[in-house]
Amino acid sequence: AFRYEFTYKSENLEELAKAIETVENTEILSIGKGLELIKDLGDATTVADQYGLNKFMGTHGIGHTRMATESDVDIKSAHPYWAFPYQDVAVVHNGQLTNYWGNRRILERSGYRFNSNCDSEIIAVYIADKMAKGIDLEQSMHDSLDELDGVFTYIVSTKDQLGMAKDHMAAKPMVIYEGEDIVACASEEVAIRNIFPHEIKTYDPYEAEVKVWQV
């Protein structure tokens, strides 16, 4: 795997993204100043070893090892999802959105572009669109619980915030641990407990719950 870093002085990130895509066999997966997205096939250990993730330095991260049920099995359809062309908004999602195509058509008519047919991508674009209109992350996520139909739990990452939302039916699991200087979220409690050498206290968010942490 290759990683390249360069400086771009213009604020027109969509122009940059489209310019990169003119290079043959090149696809842009994310853009921004605070987040770096790694998308590939394989389990967490395989991807971490391939990209040297143990050497990454940062304040927070999100990831998702999933079984594709309604999308292709390829890098483009892997999580996390980025909201093209906004910088530093990424989402991982567990569940199904039943009004995906309706919301997608609305956003496409507003000029948004989608890079996959996975319903998870709509959440990233939806949140980025709300925030571009001046709505903060927490309120954007609360709005999503009423405007996105289906069963879902998702996590959003920006350059300085981490948020989780659970739909009104709360059918998709989420477990949270909040320590003095760390927050961990996972679909299964064992995934969190395997990280910490000491006993921890976790909790399950309620239905229609949203939490946002500053990082």
Task: Give each language-model segment a name.
Residues 1-215:
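Conserved short alpha-helical segments that host acidic/polar catalytic motifs at enzyme active sites
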